[in-house]
């Protein structure tokens, strides 16, 4: 049985490699022993394989997500049986909601140990339910040539499914009996027949666009697949582009900070479009979608997963890559389009920010071209959307699928592990607290990441929400002050610590060379931050 396990596991690994997978994140455990050992041996023999070990499965899931999001390719998670696999759930949920390909290899107890009180045993087949595109079971210890052929085929099939739009996670469950030790240092002739899955070619007949005033809303663009086409299209046709901070579109022709402009009531009737074409996922600004609906503006949604619209406002969903749409669109625009475009580009911009917002403008000035920036949810991503300009060479990421605050540190470290230059994470203290364990990967792998922590002592975003209208219970239930010492967190993980007294000093820290992770703390107050935001809005009105 050991020989069969060894041989079939090698086929499993080779099939994953043939499917384009190069990154594996392992969380140690007993039941996953044969896969982990043979994977380590495989990685030693193949320098294309990158193997990371993360002792915390929850962190590992998001570390893998960060790599997959950055490289736009599937990443493997390997974990042991029981609740360990369930710890991947938050990352799988984010991968599902954000269309990120993940491959979960869940090792399991054999069928005779199921449902009878065996330790470290839970029902694992299809554990993630609707969050995975497919869940399959492979019995690596079954001795039959058909099983080996099945492994070769099914692994390639489900990995291909994970990268087929809409992309998403898949699970391969692997029940294993003892003995679990494989045969190492054995030369096996492992040949996996590569399967080529051709993409379905669909000729979509686009309706001609006739509009007096056309506007494009560029939403999150993880693939960075349409920026060049959008630039050519917008300049050629004088079409204004509202660019979400995650759209990767940062040019002179793009309009940023739409949320703050809408709050300042700067969008009047002259700026109302006849047609809006939306690209990508849901934008950071909820206000812009609300505006489209309240003003009853004709809206199309173009995306490989088009039709995902929680506002239920779009009138046409075109399942098509935005790049292809832009290349094949037929336009008949009126002479008013030039004037319309100019009015949008002439909208006032925020010229003075305060306090926490100054961190964004300081970051804007400090980060060099080609920098990868990961942004936490809640206030950081909203402030980035409103106040960061940057340029088109910089890549900005966030976990905006399920929009949770968990796993952000690990996701950013995963990003940092696969890019060549230093990267940056912008986060709050509560998000840091949620994923402190992720810092172990920074310690173990010496990853070049600058973590900027805006410490306003708790859940700052609630100060902007209706909950702030219940002051008697606000701090207890929503403000939730943590009162944690960020420097001691840095000391615990042997990370360099810097206290930022004024935002303008950020540039000097970021420009100081370092090959490891740094924790940069800026202390703030969420009540003051709320007041500062209101004053900035008043100045814009």
From Swiss-Prot:
MF terms from GO for this chain are: 2-succinyl-5-enolpyruvyl-6-hydroxy-3-cyclohexene-1-carboxylic-acid synthase activity; magnesium ion binding; manganese ion binding; thiamine pyrophosphate binding
Sorted alphabetically, the keyword list is:
Magnesium, Manganese, Menaquinone biosynthesis, Metal-binding, Thiamine pyrophosphate, Transferase
| Assembly and interaction partners | Homodimer.
The UniProt record lists the EC number as 2.2.1.9
Protein origin, superkingdom:
Bacteria
Protein family: Belongs to the TPP enzyme family. MenD subfamily.
Name of this protein: 2-succinyl-5-enolpyruvyl-6-hydroxy-3-cyclohexene-1-carboxylate synthase
Q: Which GO terms describe its biological process?
A: menaquinone biosynthetic process
Biological role: Catalyzes the thiamine diphosphate-dependent decarboxylation of 2-oxoglutarate and the subsequent addition of the resulting succinic semialdehyde-thiamine pyrophosphate anion to isochorismate to yield 2-succinyl-5-enolpyruvyl-6-hydroxy-3-cyclohexene-1-carboxylate (SEPHCHC).
What gene does the UniProt entry assign to this protein?
menD
Q: Which cofactor does it need?
A: Mg(2+); Mn(2+); thiamine diphosphate
Catalysed reactions, as listed in the record: isochorismate + 2-oxoglutarate + H(+) = 5-enolpyruvoyl-6-hydroxy-2-succinyl-cyclohex-3-ene-1-carboxylate + CO2
Biochemical pathway:
Quinol/quinone metabolism; 1,4-dihydroxy-2-naphthoate biosynthesis; 1,4-dihydroxy-2-naphthoate from chorismate: step 2/7; Quinol/quinone metabolism; menaquinone biosynthesis
How the cofactor binds, per note? Binds 1 thiamine pyrophosphate per subunit.
The record's listing under CDD domains reads: TPP_PYR_MenD, TPP_SHCHC_synthase
Question: Any keyword Signal?
Answer: no
Listed InterPro entries? MenaQ_synth_MenD, MenD_middle, THDP-binding, Thiamin_PyroP_enz_TPP-bd_dom, TPP_enzyme_TPP-bd
